[in-house]
């Protein structure tokens, strides 16, 4: 009796909620490209697990923000990487896909690639924002890079790294014209009148650093415009509990806190005050005027500054190549500064029309059927590996 061929094995690691979204999109695409019975396993979050992914370790173990803040978690994170490397070298997968989390994944991809395991990395790290030493690390670790932004492929190919532009799955998921009224009805918000969405982050460290400033800014805006309403999504029950002391210390705010549904909350809004991150791209795809802010501990900020970061940190500005929305960062992010800038974004109709044009063009560029494009590249990498003598 002929032996049955072994099933394909796709190992994958995602270390952030945004990576969980990207990886789940890729898993959906791979399901239609690879044979039934293909095994998908590694480190992932709830969206990946919902597709049938076998998470050997929970993604939350890797979700640590900032240089200084990560120090106390380094032993556990390195232990997880060492154990996963041991497992993958003992039973090599058909391909390894690292999704974002470059500090963790490059250290895993390098020895896997040296052992002959094909490596694909989904989401190019910010080589265009930081000094270029990282690109040498990429060249040693990665067989093929999946890029979510169009300008990244040329930078990588110049350094000898195979790369494909696959677009961003958020651009496929979000409609070109947002349904603001429908979102308000779905959330039970007022159908008339101005609404500002406020997103201070999803980690305790973020809430501790910028939460009080955001709440003080809300209070100032409401004082200036009593008709204003605010909506704030809480991604988890734990985050809602983190926000409770801030809510209690600012009684009388016209603030609705939703259970998750961040995209719906932003869709319902006329303007957004948001902590920097992938969510700023989501806000741009929803065609919303916004103010981007963040605060990190002083030492982390100094390290970032010395690394040569771009003059802008928000993805809408990075993609546009100029400041199209304001960024108010670190000690400049006072309640008054945030309140004034956000109200200006809310009131300026000419700016709103200009941003809608800019963000619509951006949406078309990023809308590339990412799941299928990325899956095609991963499948081709597997085929090349199988064709080796």
From Swiss-Prot:
GO terms for cellular component: membrane. SUPFAM superfamilies: UDP-Glycosyltransferase/glycogen phosphorylase. Its EC number is 2.4.1.182. It is an enzyme of class 2 (transferase). Pathway: Bacterial outer membrane biogenesis; LPS lipid A biosynthesis. It catalyses: a lipid X + a UDP-2-N,3-O-bis[(3R)-3-hydroxyacyl]-alpha-D-glucosamine = a lipid A disaccharide + UDP + H(+). One of its GO terms (biological process) is lipid A biosynthetic process. One of its GO terms (molecular function) is phospholipid binding. Keywords: Glycosyltransferase, Lipid A biosynthesis, Lipid biosynthesis, Lipid metabolism, Transferase. InterPro entries: Glyco_trans_19. NCBIfam families: lpxB (TIGR00215). HAMAP family: LpxB. Belongs to the LpxB family. Condensation of UDP-2,3-diacylglucosamine and 2,3-diacylglucosamine-1-phosphate to form lipid A disaccharide, a precursor of lipid A, a phosphorylated glycolipid that anchors the lipopolysaccharide to the outer membrane of the cell. This is Lipid-A-disaccharide synthase. It comes from Paraburkholderia xenovorans (strain LB400). The gene is lpxB.
């Amino acid at each position: 009796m002929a032996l049955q061929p072994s099933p394909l094995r796709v190992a994958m690691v995602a270390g952030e909620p945004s990576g969980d979204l990207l990886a789940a999109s890729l898993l959906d695409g791979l399901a239609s490209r690879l044979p039934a019975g293909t095994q998908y396993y590694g480190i992932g979050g709830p969206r990946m697990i919902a597709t049938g992914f076998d998470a050997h370790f929970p993604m939350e173990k890797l979700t640590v923000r900032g240089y200084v803040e990560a120090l106390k978690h380094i032993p556990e994170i390195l232990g997880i990487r060492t154990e996963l490397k041991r497992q993958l070298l003992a039973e090599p997968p058909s391909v390894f896909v690292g999704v974002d989390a470059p500090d963790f994944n490059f250290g895993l991809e390098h020895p896997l690639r040296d052992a002959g395991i094909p490596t694909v990395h989904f989401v190019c790290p910010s080589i265009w924002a930081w000094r270029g030493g990282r690109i040498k690390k990429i060249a040693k670790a990665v067989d093929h890079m999946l890029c979510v932004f169009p300008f990244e492929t040329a930078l990588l190919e110049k350094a000898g790294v195979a790369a494909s532009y696959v677009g961003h799955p958020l651009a496929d998921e979000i409609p070109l014209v947002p349904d603001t009224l429908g979102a308000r009805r779905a959330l039970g918000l007022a159908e008339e009148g101005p609404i500002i969405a406020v997103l201070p982050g999803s980690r305790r460290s973020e809430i501790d650093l910028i939460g009080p400033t955001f709440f003080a800014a809300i209070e100032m805006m409401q004082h200036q415009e009593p008709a204003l309403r605010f909506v704030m999504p809480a991604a988890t029950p734990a985050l809602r509990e983190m926000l409770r002391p801030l809510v209690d210390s600012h009684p009388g705010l016209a603030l609705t806190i939703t259970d998750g549904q961040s995209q719906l909350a932003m869709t319902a809004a006329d303007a957004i005050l948001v902590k920097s991150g992938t969510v700023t791209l989501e806000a741009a795809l929803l065609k919303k005027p916004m103010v981007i802010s963040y605060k990190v501990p002083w030492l982390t900020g100094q390290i970032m500054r010395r690394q040569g970061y771009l003059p802008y940190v928000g993805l809408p500005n990075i993609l546009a190549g100029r400041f199209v929305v304001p960024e108010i960062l670190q000690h400049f992010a006072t309640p008054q500064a945030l309140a004034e800038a956000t109200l200006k974004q809310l009131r300026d109709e000419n700016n709103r029309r200009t941003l809608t044009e800019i963000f619509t063009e951006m949406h078309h560029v990023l809308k590339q059927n990412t799941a299928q494009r990325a899956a095609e590249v991963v499948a081709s990498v597997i085929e090349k590996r199988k064709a080796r003598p």
